[in-house]
A protein has these predicted regions:
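Short, charged, amphipathic alpha-helical segments
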Residues: 33-45, 62-69, 90
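Residue-level detector of alpha-helical secondary structure
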Residues: 9-13, 17-20, 24, 44, ...
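Short terminal alpha-helical segments
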Residues: 1-40, 103
Length: 106
């Protein structure tokens, strides 16, 4: 019997919610306008789109992969500006892996 490493949808959705919440809290505390605008304009909206797509299970693998990769690339740019944001990059990388596992086990 082959065991599928499928990530539970509710855990994935909770991780997205926690990540967005932590990004928003960090934004309020840090007051770094350029970084906050990158998160607010590029990363957070895509994370919510990903969450909605996973929640209703209405997505194409390529679309979801493209969105999470774009989030990762933007967060990498943020880390280049300020390495203090490296934990968010790591969390989005883990989220990316979990999403890829989730969609491959669909």
């Amino acid at each position: 019997m082959k065991k599928n490493p499928k990530i539970l949808t509710k855990d994935l959705l909770a991780e997205i919610d926690n990540l967005v919440e932590d990004i928003q809290i960090k934004g309020v505390l840090s007051q770094k306008q350029k970084i906050n605008s990158i998160f607010a304009e590029n990363v957070i909206p895509l994370l919510f789109e990903i969450k909605t797509s996973v929640e209703i299970e209405n997505f194409s693998q390529n679309d979801l992969r493209e969105k999470i990769n774009f989030c990762l690339a933007n967060t990498s740019d943020i880390v280049d500006i300020d390495s203090e944001y490296a934990p968010f990059y790591s969390r989005i990388r883990v989220l990316r892996e979990n999403i890829l596992l989730r969609i491959s086990g669909r």
